Amino acid sequence: AESNTGRSDALILLSLNKRTKKITLVSFLRDSYTYMNIPDAARNPERCCKLNHSYRWGGYPVLIETLENDYKIEIDHYISVDFKSFPKLIDALGGVTLKIEPYEAEYINRTTTQIDKIQSGDAVKLNGAQALVYTRIRHVDAAGDLGRTARQRTIITALIKSAQGASLGQLNNAMDIVLPNVHTNYGKGEIISLLTQAFAQKWMNYDIAQMVMPSEGNYVAARIYTYYGRVARMQLDTWVIDYPVAARELQLALYGKTNINIGSDHVSAIDLYNQGLVPTLGGSTASGTRAQSSHTAPAQTSQVETQPTEATAAHETTSPAAEPATAAEPEEAND
């Protein structure tokens, strides 16, 4: 986003598990149709819109609450980097090296004049300005926004690799440059402690896994009429999601277990939409309203009792640019 009140351009959760020595990057599709408990109901009386609007209308608290409600996970911290600050983070670590496809280089060089030309290749080094442009392109191929989320995770992975060869002093210097330009609920002392642990325990050498939520098959393209800001009902191109199934999948990936049971009576929100209904965002119940009607249900509440106890408070989320929060650990892996 261009400011602290813009829509989130990237929503990426970073999970670091010291027990399994694994980092997981999860991109949330920003056009996901969801309920959000925004404080100003006049902005959207139905409180249903695209996921990235939760940041614009309610800031970090509403964004985090929405993700927690939809996917039944816990998020403790956030780090937000805007478009002006993002290049500084890249440059502070000496740039990033990654594979650039010929069609990506051609598209960037043809559509962007404010940066140095980018070459294609298996190991191309980008500076901060070039990396920002790379993370934002989405009309370059048929993958669209899915391709963009993949490029955002590629940049984060490349950043972690850049940090592998840095000294603790270099990492501290990078933080001194970046911290004045980010928004976070981490204290500076906490960040220094995390950096010290990351360096001593070689977190940057952990295996890195990537995911997109919802995954393929758990969402469908939809056109829904809803309130957009203070404007009367407007058509919204979005994704209708089977949240209980998606939440169960994410819990298993992050925690290694789940407390979500998908019963035989489960009716997918996707099926409801395909039947000409706009599903209430409870998702796990056989309910819906005719297209273009109001949505009154809060975020989906599938058969969840409590958060999995093994690995709660494990994850970070980012908004609005493409940087992950500093890694936190699952409780069971804490020192």
Where are the model-predicted features located?
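Non-catalytic, solvent-exposed segments at the cell envelope interface
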Residues: 1-335
